[in-house]
């Protein structure tokens, strides 16, 4: 079996999956997931890249999954959800923890491949924090927003010591595994970064809440996507998350 570390570089399709759970059930789901659903997905081509606790919502479990391409995605998902002994044995218990599991963004790289350096699976979580910032595009052209990001936002991030490890945008191909719904009508552009600890992340998070002038260079065609404050997630890796 390949490890998640070996599979990371081949992914061109991604899912950012946010599950809303019943109160007090997050650790139950994480325990099930880490014991049963990481290697068993990876072996069929559905690569679990990271599993996280949302620091700002105790009832939210977030994970990132990757696939080689859209052609292999339905095959991998059918192999896992239709035939994997691990899923068939534990799906009722897992589903019983969830209020909602349909908050899914189907994504592709906006430019260069993500630098998602997975670690060997172990049993201890690092103190790292991952931040995800999500801009909702509406009808804004993704290429125009990407140009604004590269020339206006990215230099400000870099000047603050932040270097995104992934920049992703909505994959607008139809969902080819309809048993698992995705948010097909929400077009987004997002970036992801890593901090060594919550203390390292906190100054930037505070700074970003009071950023002034970041919209100044936005062309008129991009304005609808920047008038809404972006959604921000602060994510702490679980103990066996490939991303640590």
Regions found by a protein language model. Give the residues of each.
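Short, surface-exposed loop/turn motifs at beta-strand boundaries within globular domains
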Residues: 12-14, 56, 128
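Surface-exposed interaction/gating patches
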Residues: 16-23, 28, 109-179, 183-198, ...
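Short, solvent-exposed loop/turn elements at beta->coil junctions and helix N-caps
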Residues: 52-53, 170
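An amphipathic, aromatic/His-enriched active-site/gating alpha helix that lines ligand/cofactor pockets
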Residues: 2-5, 9, 28-50, 56-57, ...
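Hydrophobic, helix-prone linear segments
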Residues: 1-15, 20, 25
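Short acidic/glycine-enriched loop/turn segments that link adjacent beta-strands
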Residues: 56-59, 174
């Amino acid at each position: 079996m390949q490890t998640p570390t070996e599979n990371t570089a081949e992914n061109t399709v991604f899912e950012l999956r946010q599950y809303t759970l019943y109160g007090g059930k997050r650790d139950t789901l994480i325990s099930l997931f880490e014991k049963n659903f990481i290697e068993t997905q990876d072996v069929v081509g559905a690569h679990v890249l990271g599993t996280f606790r949302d620091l700002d919502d105790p009832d939210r479990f977030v994970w990132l999954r990757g696939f080689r391409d859209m052609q292999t995605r339905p095959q991998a998902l059918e192999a896992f959800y239709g035939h994997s002994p691990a899923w068939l044995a534990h799906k009722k218990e897992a589903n019983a923890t969830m209020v909602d599991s349909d908050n899914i963004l189907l994504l592709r790289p906006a430019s260069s491949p993500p630098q998602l350096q997975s670690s060997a699976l172990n049993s201890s979580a690092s103190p790292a924090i991952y931040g995800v910032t999500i801009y909702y595009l509406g009808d804004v052209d993704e290429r125009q927003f990407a140009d604004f990001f590269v020339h206006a936002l990215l230099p400000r991030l870099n000047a603050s010591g932040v270097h995104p490890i992934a920049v992703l945008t909505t994959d607008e191909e139809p969902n080819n595994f309809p048993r698992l719904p995705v948010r097909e009508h929400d077009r987004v552009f997002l970036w992801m970064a890593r901090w060594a600890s919550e203390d390292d992340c906190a100054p930037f998070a505070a700074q970003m809440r009071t950023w002034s002038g970041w919209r100044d260079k936005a062309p008129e065609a991009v304005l609808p996507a920047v008038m809404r404050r972006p959604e921000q997630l602060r994510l702490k890796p679980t103990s066996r998350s490939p991303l640590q």
